[in-house]
């Protein structure tokens, strides 16, 4: 990364699994994740809070901005990366596909609630099934998203304003 970025905008970095080396296409080693965070800080990038994303996007200045997102709510995020982000209060969005919550390898609703209590942490909808929705009809897509919304309301007490399309 360089301090001389000409283009204005917000860089979005997406992560999935942490220290789950048997999934190389979606995994990052913690030593590399920590290098990412340190490099971002060293180059004076600003971590964007999701609540301010729209105003940051509409009000582009010369500051270099980054939004971190984490997909799928794998337990490895909670165990490995969450303590680092929490300690540094680095803002991010955790996108949750709700059907898998509590399943083997995934976070629980209690863990997600714990994270959601932090002002810098946001929980987003990643659908219910995490299916490749392009292959579904409008009714199936609507039903899938509505199931996730119901899970959010039941377990967190609100419907998230953030949505990340599975495989999108």
Question: PLM features: residue spans?
Answer:
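Noncatalytic alpha-helical scaffolds and linker/capping helices
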Residues: 71-73
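N-terminal pre-catalytic segment of deacetylase/amide-hydrolase enzymes
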Residues: 1-66
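Metal-dependent polysaccharide deacetylase catalytic core of the NodB/CE4 family, i.e.
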Residues: 8, 13-19, 63-66, 75-78, ...
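Distinct, well-ordered alpha-helical segments
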Residues: 55-59, 81-82, 112
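Short, solvent-exposed loop/turn and secondary-structure capping segments
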Residues: 25, 79-80
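Glycine-rich, phosphate-binding/catalytic loops in enzymes
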Residues: 29, 84-87
């Amino acid at each position: 990364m360089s301090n001389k970025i000409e283009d204005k905008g917000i860089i979005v970095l997406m992560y999935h699994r942490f220290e789950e080396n048997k999934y190389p296409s979606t995994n990052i080693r913690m030593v590399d994740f920590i290098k990412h965070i340190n490099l971002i800080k060293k180059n004076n990038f600003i971590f964007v809070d999701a609540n301010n994303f729209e105003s940051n996007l509409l009000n582009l200045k010369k500051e270099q901005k980054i939004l971190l997102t984490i997909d799928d709510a794998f337990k490895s995020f909670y165990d490995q990366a969450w303590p680092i982000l929490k300690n540094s209060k680095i803002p991010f969005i955790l996108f949750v596909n709700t059907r898998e919550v509590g399943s083997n390898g995934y976070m629980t609703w209690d863990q997600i609630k714990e994270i959601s209590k932090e002002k810098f942490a946001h929980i987003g909808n990643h659908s219910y099934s995490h299916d490749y929705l392009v292959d579904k009809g409008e009714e199936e897509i609507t039903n899938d998203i509505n199931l996730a919304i119901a899970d959010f309301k039941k377990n967190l007490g609100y419907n998230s304003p953030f949505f990340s399309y599975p495989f999108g």
